[in-house]
């Protein structure tokens, strides 16, 4: 069966180190050249896919498809829409080997990213046609309407791949603070601190994993009355769009304590490693703590606590709480635009992504306000 691996920093095309580039190998450990050529195009050429996390997402989708082709005796370059439809239908009726739960429709559509590979192969004359067709469909109202919808001349219709399934985006769910406490009670000091960073700043797990020790500001001469929050610029973000987060001073102080105590012990356990020395959060054996590991730690704690939640739900909790707070602030600062402010804080490119939190507030305002009051003491 095919194997998926990733390059290290020793991989230096054109003299530049490129760790994290996917590499697909066959059972004899030979390069599967069409797939590897596409991965190199994504990583080195295409300007909109500059993130290793994006490369991994595409690679894992193609890897799953390649294994399906091998298991069924399908030639990757001879499949038609019937085979791709069968692959989709298997996910619609089956469960994930990883989670044991049914596949979310968004996951199924994400797996169909493999079709971008076929489009690329057609452009380079590797195959004659893509194994799917496109058709016009009416765009659903699951997403909040764009602020520029009055300029849309499409009549509410888009051309889409006919193999993708209808997906209604669910409302984000804020975690009640009681559930968060139960989860945190199952965690060690470092992991509780990471949860606090997510709750109090809205940072994603990859952004927390990407925090560097040098980014942690000194607070010796700072008073909480003067500067209750400290801005920190994030460089390792989704879509490589730098933004600011605003952790409270007390959180910075607790993180400093972790650096001097638990992190110092972990660092002594590591071999000399510049990545470990620069990363803020480390594993017990002194390696940088990765985003996937952060998510797994939280999921395992949720299971032990009997809570249904994901690490990303912490970001939803922050977003809903912050929007409720900003809306209250407009009574004192009328010129404040809560949605645009929240969009900037969260780093959303599309305002409609932020607007979904308005609907969340309408359905779960009490829980969100309680969470905000407990976290910040900001609400009366």
Describe each region flagged by the PLM.
Residues 295-344:
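Short, basic (Lys/Arg/His-rich) helix/loop patches that form interaction surfaces
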Residues 216-218, 307, 330-358, 363, ...:
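Short, polar N-cap/turn motifs at the start of nucleic acid-interacting alpha helices
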Residues 125-129, 198-225:
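Short, charged phosphate-coordinating catalytic segments
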Residues 1-3, 372-380:
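C-terminal secondary-structure termini that scaffold catalytic or DNA-interacting sites
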Residues 173-205, 338:
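Basic, Lys/Arg- and aromatic-enriched nucleic-acid-binding interface segment
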Residues 210-254:
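Conserved tyrosine-mediated DNA breakage-rejoining catalytic core shared by Y-recombinases
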Residues 35-53, 62-148, 182:
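N-terminal core-binding DNA-recognition domain of tyrosine recombinases/integrases
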Residues 248-308, 322-325:
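Active-site/catalytic core of tyrosine-dependent DNA strand-transfer enzymes
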